[in-house]
């Protein structure tokens, strides 16, 4: 039980800190833009690996390029997280694409374009 609470807290801290790095332009790669968001983080039960799911309101190759850039900068990102979060072992990060946000915008656009007729 205690391990699950620790895992959950660490996941939310990682979401917050990685999001702050992206937002404050702590990552200098131009492919990492302000339209990115950390959707969720999933840490393995042994707390060694973490999957970081990245979403964007921009569609297509922009998100793929940003995920590649984040994976290239994961050593730097882990170093920054070590400075900001006091944890014995920081999980190894891997960044993955998450299409939840773009799908939500797409569904919202469809709903807005529906015309309801008064009967």
From Swiss-Prot:
GO terms for biological process: maturation of SSU-rRNA. GO terms for cellular component: cytosol. Disulfide bonds: none annotated. It comes from the Bacteria. It is found in: Cytoplasm. Its main location: cytoplasm. Pfam families: RBFA. Keywords: Cytoplasm, Ribosome biogenesis. InterPro entries: KH_dom-like_a/b (IPR015946), RbfA (IPR000238), RbfA_dom_sf (IPR023799), Ribosome-bd_factorA_CS (IPR020053). The keyword Cytoplasm applies. GO terms for molecular function: ribosomal small subunit binding. NCBIfam families: rbfA (TIGR00082). Monomer. Binds 30S ribosomal subunits, but not 50S ribosomal subunits or 70S ribosomes. Belongs to the RbfA family. One of several proteins that assist in the late maturation steps of the functional core of the 30S ribosomal subunit. Associates with free 30S ribosomal subunits (but not with 30S subunits that are part of 70S ribosomes or polysomes). Required for efficient processing of 16S rRNA. May interact with the 5'-terminal helix region of 16S rRNA. HAMAP family: RbfA. This is Ribosome-binding factor A. The gene is rbfA.
